[in-house]
Amino acid sequence: MFLILLLCTDRKDMYQTLTFYHSFFRWLVLASLVLAIYRGYAGLIKNAAFSRSDNLVRHWTATIAHIQLMIGITLYAQSPVIKYFWNNKSTALKNLDTTFFALIHLILMLTAIVLITIGSALAKRRTADKEKFRTMLTWFALALLIILAAIPWPFSPLANRPYWR
């Protein structure tokens, strides 16, 4: 459905649609990471068995993050801010808001997605349940910290955007 919406819109509408979905999926990524971290912590503390539900949370957290990555990359390619940055690097580097979206946000979010991907893959391959929980908890928590720093919150000194766009 997402791709159909993009194909049926012109460039300006596509950019606005991508911005909306990227903003919406931010909350799904955050919620799924918090849930996965909670399940990792609770499973580790309680010495619980790594259940099918835990595995689904691990899997869907990574999947949601990857969907967000695809939306973000498409948005990056369409963004007038990014186009301005690459066409006017020397001037654009002096503007923190532009530099944030062109470089800082991109690098930090890519790093976070890599951490989620590695953490998910390692947790899947661990044999001991305690190690599955520990791996998921550690890698996903690191990714969450990076994501929280890289989101352009309304109160961020780097760049700010509203909670919903």
Model-assigned labels for residue ranges:
Residues F2-R165:
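Membrane-embedded alpha-helical bundles that constitute the cytochrome b-like, heme-associated redox core
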